[in-house]
Amino acid sequence: MGKMGKRFAAAKAAVEGKENITVEEAVALLKGNSKTKFDETIEIAMKLGVDPRHADQMVRGTVNLPNGTGKTVRVAVFARGPKAEEATAAGADIVGAEDLMETVQGGTIEFDRCIATPDMMPIVGRLGKVLGPRNLMPNPKIGTVTMDVKEAVEAAKGGQVQFKAEKAGVVHAGVGKASFTEAQLVENVRAFVDAVSKAKPSGSKGTYMQKINLTSTMGPGVSLSVENATGN
């Protein structure tokens, strides 16, 4: 068994039998198991009682993690004139209009978040088949179609996380790095869970939050107590 295999086996043994534990216990376990040479991402996955194929059961939104994500987020902005200048001044990595559309159509997508002013949507709309599957399509419901370009760019750069339920009703996201303190990770996890809780759709039937798992990039997952994670 190689080093990585032994490391994973040891990490798995450490979490064996530990289910429905508190956020604090889970974070301590994951940090203790993180022995890789790179800074692992701590990821959360939540199984929700929704069928996102129905419009009244779609779950999506954003949350500003209090301690950021630890990741460098590359932001693209579709804008012209003063708004393009505002985006650049706010720290956007790529700013453009038709030229940016052509770049994306050509298959070059060197950004993690996409923002657009409302007047740019006829252009951005042509990129739906490219941006949509990557969850990069600007949307007014999550604040990425806006005239307040400065605020949107700063939020994206400052640790704002977007979430959206997938077909199986699962929401997942990175909530920090293994190098974060336990307190920082706990705070981020609780902020994310709270945001998903508040995004409960009108069509959700039965138990909304069914399972919550926390894992690191190279480690096994641990099951959280839903009651503890939600503060109920």
Curated annotation (Swiss-Prot):
CDD domains: Ribosomal_L1. GO terms for cellular component: cytosolic large ribosomal subunit. It holds the Pfam family Ribosomal_L1. Keywords: Repressor, Ribonucleoprotein, Ribosomal protein, RNA-binding, rRNA-binding, Translation regulation, tRNA-binding. It comes from the Bacteria. GO terms for molecular function: rRNA binding; structural constituent of ribosome; tRNA binding. HAMAP family: Ribosomal_uL1_B. PANTHER family: 54S RIBOSOMAL PROTEIN L1, MITOCHONDRIAL (PTHR36427), LARGE RIBOSOMAL SUBUNIT PROTEIN UL1M (PTHR36427:SF3). This is Large ribosomal subunit protein uL1. The lineage of its organism: Bacteria, Pseudomonadati, Pseudomonadota, Alphaproteobacteria, Rhodobacterales. The gene is rplA.
